[in-house]
């Protein structure tokens, strides 16, 4: 599909990673951005005007790169508002792990589609997903037209190094919208032999490694009792970070941990809503930022958030950082927006869709500026971070295809069917229990 956006404000990111806004046209040919500039011709020397399947008057709207949800567990939609108000480890052991064992057949497929629908309404065009039954998850991505990077939730109870390697090869060859990076659930759920196996696979495939890292204070204390090292230091000793990667949450960090992240060029993914809801702590974002460490933002799963909304995550990311450091000027709004877009793309190794530029994949969002919360237009970047909302998302395009527009989904599924299937799954698993 070839699409022309005209009369558009366009958020662009230059080679020095500075945002600016132009008023131009943007052309999409197939899955790629082929022109950004004035006029109508993609090539000013061309004899003929390009042929477009769709021409969209974007007056009063802002085109931005799609948000990258850099940490999530998408199919956990079935546990949204089911088990809440518990600390992390009690929540996992009493509610999450037992109910996950009851997922059967194609449950994960349908639950993943529900999550993808929510992503699209929030302008999220790709996710970095860790969950079980990954062939069902990735099938949902392929069938809806979404973009997903998977990593493994390998632990003492689920999967094996052999399954991890099988999925790594399968997903990386499946589609240009799917990829796989090595990982495991967490140090506290994964024994030494499995950790060593992951390190060997990282060396074999020259792959980054990802995991939950320093999410709670007790996690770090227990790891130090077992190994005499923090989770970050343990993974460094095992050789997991030879080819990059990083950690999700990264709250309870020590000075040496920051040094490892800096020296290995790792990424820290912050998940503010989940960390607040589970009372895990506040990520020391400013320490990462001041050390030049790449940062990204994730929603975490819909059972611990419970919302998949990048606008909310951006506001909480900046707000919590300011309060933690007692510094209202600590991290500027454009840096937060970078984390939610290009920073996430870098973490996920999908740099071909990190920004709106010629030659990049057409993963973009059209933001409605003619809403009270986006006026006046003093600073549109700050509006996105401080006052933006998913109500402003008018259109979401992934890989050149419009998957969501004006409240309607174009993913090949009836939303009512997805809602019905999702409710049926949790009713079956819970025995019709509902926490009212």
Spans of features found by a protein language model:
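Alpha-helical scaffold segments that flank or form the walls of functional sites
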Residues: 80-145, 165-174, 422-431
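Active-site microenvironment of metallo-dependent hydrolases
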Residues: 1-24, 29, 45-48, 340-436
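His/Asp/Glu-enriched, well-ordered alpha-helical/loop segment
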Residues: 237-244, 286-369, 387-390
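Metal-coordinating catalytic core of metallo-dependent amide/deamination hydrolases
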Residues: 136-254
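Divalent metal-coordination and catalytic microenvironments
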Residues: 8, 26, 31, 60, ...
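A conserved active-site cap/scaffold subdomain adjacent to cofactor or substrate pockets
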Residues: 255-256, 262-293, 298-299
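Active-site gating loops and adjacent loop-to-helix segments of metal-dependent hydrolytic enzymes
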Residues: 78-110, 144-152, 170-172, 217-244, ...
